[in-house]
Structure formats: structure tokens, C-alpha cells
Design a protein with these regions (language model features):
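Rossmann-fold NAD(P)-binding glycine/threonine-rich loop
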Residues: 100-148, 158-164
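Acidic/polar active-site rim loop that often engages polyanionic ligands
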Residues: 145-154, 225-227, 246
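Hydrophobic alpha-helical segments, chiefly the membrane-spanning helices
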Residues: 267-272
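NAD(P)+-binding Rossmann beta1-loop-alpha1 motif at the extreme N-terminus of oxidoreductases
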Residues: 1-52, 56
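Short loop/edge segments at beta-strand edges and connector loops
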Residues: 75, 117, 183
Length: 272
């Protein structure tokens, strides 16, 4: 199966990043969001990234012009998914919202299109099972910033077809990502491990174990992490981390209990 047209639903940080790399690959890419202000912000995010690349000599103006031709911005979901080979949902981590979108996608997307969710923690089965085509639905978890981070976590559920898995792996390869394949368990492989580290770092900060800067430095120099857990929590967004923690707490109890509001505020302390 070839990739010619991709639709990305949700123009936030993740959605705009996914749309950007698809356009750079040469695929006709449609970025869709129901809120015009969100769509405009997504457009600005992409423009800003490309302009930075030009200033640093990593991108040319000609490349930007070519990539821009591959991008279309839509408010209407039906228009966005028309003729798409792949639809990637990247809306906030709210299960009912994702279910609603996939119910719509089953109706309006091409019947041979692969339908992916970029969720970082929500069960793929819980999304797929609201449709009558679960075999076409898969998790494709990208990482922020999408154009830079090399990992793509592919999440298969029990009803996912081998064809769908192979297609997702092919897309990852074409986009220059290193793919891992994991089972549909709470938090998958990355969030299940990652939020524990971030959660504990926030607790350590609130207990006065060390400063934010020193906690981050401990992991960067002691374990070769490119970014400290508190820095990463701020980059991902404490609201996103909270949603992931709340989701995982239902399955793993105290290990993933969200820190208190006071602890969260402290995590925003300068890292340097």
C-alpha cells in the first residue's frame, strides 16, 4: 500500500508536527481542526520551525516553498479525509472525544484508509471497538518535537490486522523514524516508564531532595538522558502529564497517582 495523501486531525503541537513531517516527505497533507484559532496556531508552529531551519542553514527557502505546496489546512473533517490513505488523530487525551472522532472517521474516510491515533496512554482497543472496522485502527505515538524525535511507538491491539501493522511500520520508516511495536497495555512502553520518572522527580522536588536544576542534571549526566525529567515535564505540558497519570492510576494505583497542585507548581521552577 502506497502513501499519497495523509490527513491529520488536531492542529496542536503534536498534530502540526506530524503534518509538517508528512508534507516534508512529499505527501499531500491536510491538517484539520474544528477551531480556526487552533488551526492558525498550528500553521504558525510549522512556519516558525521552517524559518528557524532557514536561519540556521538547515533548510532552504525553495524547500520551504515545496513543502508548503503539500500542506492544506481544513476546518471541515470530511474535506480533510477525502481520498486519504492514512488518517492520524492527534486531539487532546480525552477518550470520549477520540471515540467520537473515530465514529465519524469510519463513516467519512475511504474504506481502505488506515486510521491511527497518536494517543500516548489511552487504550487503542477502547477507541477501535466503537467502530465496525477495528482491524484498520492502530496506535502511532509520535514524540515532541515530532520533526526531531526519532521514535515512533506503534501500538497493536487484538483486532488490529497485520496489514495495518505493516503499513504503520512502513510509514514510520518513510518518515525516518525508528519504530517499536508494543502491545495495547496502559501507557504502552514509553508513557508507562516515562511518567514514573517525571512523577517521582516532582515529588523529590517538593520534598527538597535537590533543586530542579540538580535533579535534571542527575539524570542528564548520570544516565545520559538528553533532557532532565522536570524539563521534559514542562515541554510535554503538566496538563498532558496529569491526564496520562490519571489514566494509568486506574490500572496501577499509587505508582501513578498525580502529585498535588503544589508539587506541580514547584516543577515549573527554572532548571538553571
Amino acid at each position: 500500500m502506497q502513501v499519497h495523501t495523509v490527513a491529520v486531525v488536531g492542529a496542536g503541537t503534536m498534530g502540526s508536527g506530524i503534518a509538517q513531517i508528512c508534507a516534508q516527505k512529499g505527501w499531500q497533507t491536510r491538517l484539520c481542526d474544528a477551531f480556526p484559532e487552533s488551526l492558525e496556531k498550528g500553521m504558525e508552529n510549522i512556519e516558525r520551525f521552517w524559518d528557524k531551519g532557514i536561519k540556521k542553514g538547515k533548510t532552504t527557502k525553495q524547500e520551504k516553498e515545496e513543502w508548503s505546496k503539500n500542506l492544506q489546512f481544513c476546518i471541515d473533517l470530511t474535506e480533510a479525509v477525502d481520498g486519504a490513505d492514512l488518517v492520524i488523530e492527534a486531539v487532546p487525551e480525552i477518550l470520549e472525544l477520540k471515540k467520537e472522532i473515530f465514529i465519524q472517521l469510519e463513516e467519512i474516510a475511504p474504506k481502505n484508509a488506515i486510521l491511527a491515533t497518536n494517543t500516548s496512554s489511552i487504550s487503542i482497543s477502547s477507541i477501535a471497538n466503537v467502530t465496525s472496522c477495528p482491524e484498520r485502527i492502530i496506535g502511532m505515538h509520535f514524540f515532541n518535537p515530532v520533526p526531531i524525535m526519532k521514535l515512533l511507538e506503534i501500538v497493536k491491539h487484538e483486532k488490529c490486522s497485520e496489514k495495518t501493522i505493516s503499513f504503520a511500520e512502513l510509514v514510520g520508516e518513510k518518515l525516518g523514524k525508528e519504530t517499536i511495536l508494543v502491545k495495547d497495555i496502559p501507557g504502552f512502553a514509553t508513557s508507562r516508564l516515562g511518567v514514573v520518572l517525571g512523577n517521582e522527580a516532582i515529588r523529590m522536588l517538593s520534598e527538597g531532595v535537590a533543586s530542579a536544576s540538580d535533579i535534571d542534571t542527575a539524570m542528564k549526566l548520570g544516565y545520559k538522558h538528553p533532557m532532565g525529567p522536570l524539563e521534559l515535564s514542562d515541554l510535554v505540558g503538566l496538563d498532558v502529564r496529569r491526564d496520562i497519570l490519571n489514566s494509568l492510576a486506574e490500572s496501577f494505583c499509587l505508582l501513578y497517582t498525580s502529585p498535588s497542585p503544589r508539587d506541580k507548581r514547584q516543577s515549573r521552577m527554572p532548571s538553571s
